[in-house]
Amino acid sequence: MAQSTTYSRVLGTGSYLPPNRVSNQDLAARLAKQGIETSDEWIVARTGIHARHFAEPDVTTSDLALIASQRAIEAADVDPQAIDLIIVATSTPDFVFPSTACLLQNKLGIKNNGAAFDVQAVCSGFAYAVATADSFIRSGQHRTALVVGAETFSRILDFNDRTTCVLFGDGAGAVVLQASDEPGVLASALHADGSHSNILCTPGNVNGGIVQGSAFLHMDGQAVFKLAVNVLEKVAVEALQKADLQPEQIDWLIPHQANIRIMQSTCRKLGLPQERMVVTVHEHGNTSAASIPLALDVAVRDGRIQRGHNVLIEGVGGGFTWGASVIRY
């Protein structure tokens, strides 16, 4: 008798944006007070971003993750106590330790002593977290996973640097994965190249209670753009080959929402019409690890993504890291 294959299937999605919406005009006015010139036209032309959301000072990454997770759990219609694995992808945790995942587990009231840990792969974080949870579920080690991407990038932005502070925003997205005989996550591909660590980083660190070096995000925009458009196409093709699918069989492409030009380039290289790409960067900005699950939840809730659709998610971020997963929703 043939042994059945166990997949991890998406049961539900959820997301949350802090209510403070900051338009390009709002940001330009803030920067003008510091003698820094920018404009809505300048930002939109280079990034496609019109607005982003910033969390209030007393709101943490785990707070954003909590609301997104509650919405995903409700959509999945699962008992929170059945969740035996929590993975949070974030580069802006509440603390150095404990992990944001452990804080989230407690805030959700989950008392089953299931595993909880963070994944740090910056803007590739959600792709890394999905692949990790999928492996745990396929192995039989865990059955029901909560996978979250959550960020408060506004805390590490240098508002004297108009090339970076206009790009990023705060938010959270989540999915519930569960073991199933039905295909769900079909294939994943993950990669990294640490030789590019200096082109997107926060170079400072805390030593003896003092921040040594810069605590703010640093980015070489041209180098990131060049590397991103190259690796995103390759990792997408690799994941599709592992899933035994052709690009034209993809119903929806959900790339990391960093820059509309990078996203459109990847879509063109895969031969997909732009209409099959989910775009939220115009309203969300770059929310790092939260961007993919935020976009996924938007497209699920507005009815674009239906059961049985093939969805390709892909991310690229500091490290340098990149990854993709093919998911049958």
From Swiss-Prot:
The active site is at C123, H256, N286. NCBIfam families: fabH, PRK09352.1. The lineage of its organism: Bacteria, Pseudomonadati, Pseudomonadota, Betaproteobacteria, Burkholderiales. It holds the Pfam family ACP_syn_III. Catalyzes the condensation reaction of fatty acid synthesis by the addition to an acyl acceptor of two carbons from malonyl-ACP. Catalyzes the first condensation reaction which initiates fatty acid synthesis and may therefore play a role in governing the total rate of fatty acid production. Possesses both acetoacetyl-ACP synthase and acetyl transacylase activities. Its substrate specificity determines the biosynthesis of branched-chain and/or straight-chain of fatty acids. It comes from Paraburkholderia phymatum (strain DSM 17167 / CIP 108236 / LMG 21445 / STM815). The last Arg residue of the ACP-binding site is essential for the weak association between ACP/AcpP and FabH. It is found in: Cytoplasm. This is Beta-ketoacyl-[acyl-carrier-protein] synthase III. Belongs to the thiolase-like superfamily. FabH family. InterPro entries: ACP_syn_III_C, ACP_syn_III_N, FabH, Thiolase-like. It comes from the Bacteria. It catalyses: malonyl-[ACP] + acetyl-CoA + H(+) = 3-oxobutanoyl-[ACP] + CO2 + CoA. Its main location: cytoplasm. The gene is fabH. Residues 257-261 are annotated as: ACP-binding. One of its GO terms (molecular function) is 3-oxoacyl-[acyl-carrier-protein] synthase activity. The keyword Metal-binding does not apply. Gene3D superfamilies: 3.40.47.10.
